[in-house]
Amino acid sequence: MEPEPHSSEAVPTAAALFAWGANSYGQLGLGHKEDVLSAQQLSDFCKSGCIKRITGGGGHSAVVTDEGSLFVCGLNKDGQLGLGHTEEVLYFTPCKSLLGCAIQQVACGWDFTIILTENGQVLSCGSNSFGQLGVPHGPRRCVIPQAIELLREKVVSIAAGLRHALAATASGTVFQWGTGLASSGRRLCPGQTLPLFLTAKEPSTVTGLENSQAVCVLAGSDHSASLTDAGELYVWGSNKHGQLASQAAFLLLPQRIEARCFQNEKIAAVWSGWTHLVAQTVTGKVFTWGRADYGQLGRTVETREGWESEKQDPSLPGSGPQKGTPSCLPCLTGATEISCGSEHNLAVIGGVCHSWGWNEHGMCGDGTEADVWAPKPVPGLRFFLGLHVGCGAGHSLALCQLPALPALGQHPSVTSPSPDATKEARSQEAMEQERNQKERHAETSPQAQSDRFRNGGLVAETLE
């Protein structure tokens, strides 16, 4: 039987990159430097469907394609884009110095970038003021990615914090470099000798992990973390906001967070903001802990003596677990993608992109600048299928599937989010609209800024 006219298959579905949030340096890749409060689609800078990794730093962004190409944009005053110059770049641009070198992962720090190739080599570019490039006698900055020669073993994971970086090798060893944690360590541990890895400007082995095998490393503004092949999480550094789930103010050496904190389940993945962490167990449960005053944890928290009071959303009922105690967030169970910015988060749940946390520059994408206290769908993306998400310090990026181009006589189609997720998205949107109307008539007090400074949409902890 011959096919009916116009019954040919639809053109394969396409994907597009969306960006929103702080944009003072063009880090959204939209060609301008105005903050964006709602998700905006980027013009094609590569085949969007082949993007495999999205991330950002203090004021720059990086995208890695399936073919291993690296595209960058945004702030570049220290050469953190690796383009051979220090001019700002308003559109995603290929890093030509790495052409022919397949990239596996990129980690963006405040003003530097760490790059991992598919063969396990690590390169760095940008500011080296705190030894964060891993080249102890190198220049103050580097505008072209250079290999970190002291990392001779194959590396499988990298991370970049505010002023320090980490790498995990194929054998499970963790290295750290950059002096970003040293100041807090000296202040909070007077009279104690800091381990070399907290003060080194070249890769130094993190002691205390000899009996474990790391598969992933993470970095916050003033802390570090490592996930092992046994599903255990080790943390060290500053515990100012309870992000280490410890009673200590500062951990000089790695300490394992007890399994009971995660309902005795093994951890499959971990993400870190500057002062909070998010972990997902092997069964898909998601736990959050750490700083909570901008809604970073997606839940209410109790405060305790020794930690400064955390602002809470008065519209959310009751008080929840302490912020330094990992607590399960049921609405995130089964999330397929999660990313942490400095103090906001993105997640893909049931195919729908969600956001929550700090929103001063619109990085939650809800069209406002009011902090978001619980995960909710990003309005402009709620009917697209979320594929990948990535955060910078104060901006957001998401790769979403677009509707398929229909054959003649057919209606557009797209692989839709699950029905339950779509229903939840609409319900949450309606509740949020009602809540926003109430908030417009409510008086709000200014947020405390005593230990923070803000610059063009960027946020940094003041390191004393």
UniProtKB/Swiss-Prot annotation:
UniProt keyword Repeat present: yes
Region Disordered, residue ranges: 301-323, 411-464
GO CC terms in record: cytoplasm; nucleus
Gene Ontology BP annotations: negative regulation of protein secretion
SUPFAM superfamilies assigned to the protein according to its UniProt record, in alphabetical order: RCC1/BLIP-II
Localization of this protein: Cytoplasm; Nucleus
Biased composition (Basic and acidic residues): 301-313, 421-443
Gene Ontology MF, one: guanyl-nucleotide exchange factor activity
Mapped RCC1 repeat ranges: 14-66, 68-118, 119-170, 172-229, 230-282, 283-349, 350-401
Protein's name according to its UniProt entry: Secretion-regulating guanine nucleotide exchange factor
Source organism of the structure: Bos taurus (Bovine)
Gene this protein is translated from: SERGEF
